[in-house]
Amino acid sequence: MIIPLISDLLALCKLKVVALILLTAEVGMFLAVPAPYLPNGLLVLSASIGISMAAASAAVFNHVVDEQIDAQMSRTNKRPLPQGKVSRNQALMWGVFLGLVGLGILQLFVNTITMVLTFVSLIGYAIIYTLYLKRATPQNIVIGGAAGAAPPVLGWTAVSGTQGIEYACLLFLIVFIWTPPHFWALAIHRVEEYKKVDVPMLPVTHGLAYTRTQILLYTVLLLLVSLLPYLASMSGLIYLVVAIALGIRFLMYAIKIYNNPDDKRIAWCTFVYSINYLMLLFVTLLFDHYWLILPLEVF
């Protein structure tokens, strides 16, 4: 009884999404200190736990708010709440617990600015996006993307406060521009389900042709924005080469979507690639930051 419940509670946390959030946050932490130094290990651990718990809390609240929608979509109807494996009250208590503990850790062991920014991001995703924007406007992903793009900034401020935060904003901008083509590709793949539950995703309100064009334009913009860390002398040639290669590959997927309007399989492949794109881009940022430095010293 207890073990299945724990498994279901963890399923509410969207652990794969949290892992990607944590990756971008930790890259922000390490880039916040100059090579060859490393950020304090205990600080990194505390910030990682706090940010992860807050992200998991936001995911739980997303499940609670979207319970009725999830029950009607084949992609989500096996989730714990629609299946009745977890009650609404249990989910709410779990979400509150994760949020309070996560924010408490950030306040006690990291710093106030990171706690405040994390709280704002949690509210932005769990309430402003999930409760209002998602159901109110086809630009829900664009506006709500600010909350999802915050983790690199949270990681940066956890280590360096506001010092050099303009560089963290470049990382924020990359994730912010990445978000629309990432989610719109999924929306094209699942457009009939979004129509069924009356969620005004862009393909539902403006049609597939318009959405394909927007994905293409945003992907071009993402390729350009991804070069900013190099242009700002934040990264070197390794990052530049990889960013261009990853961006061109993403653009090829966007062109395929544009040229194959009836093949939703391509949209799904684009969605999957976009996740790999972001992971590889941020790992490359970290590798480029340290690759010439041996041995490393603890900051």
From Swiss-Prot:
It is found in: Cell inner membrane. Its EC number is 2.5.1.141. It comes from Ruthia magnifica subsp. Calyptogena magnifica. InterPro entries: Protohaem_IX_farnesylTrfase, UbiA_prenyltransferase, UbiA_prenylTrfase_CS, UbiA_sf. Converts heme B (protoheme IX) to heme O by substitution of the vinyl group on carbon 2 of heme B porphyrin ring with a hydroxyethyl farnesyl side group. Pathway: Porphyrin-containing compound metabolism; heme O biosynthesis; heme O from protoheme: step 1/1. GO terms for cellular component: plasma membrane. It comes from the Bacteria. The keyword Transmembrane applies. One of its GO terms (biological process) is heme O biosynthetic process. Carbon 2 of the heme B porphyrin ring is defined according to the Fischer nomenclature. This is Protoheme IX farnesyltransferase. Keywords: Cell inner membrane, Cell membrane, Heme biosynthesis, Membrane, Transferase, Transmembrane, Transmembrane helix. Belongs to the UbiA prenyltransferase family. Protoheme IX farnesyltransferase subfamily. Gene3D superfamilies: UbiA prenyltransferase. It catalyses: heme b + (2E,6E)-farnesyl diphosphate + H2O = Fe(II)-heme o + diphosphate. Pfam families: UbiA (PF01040).
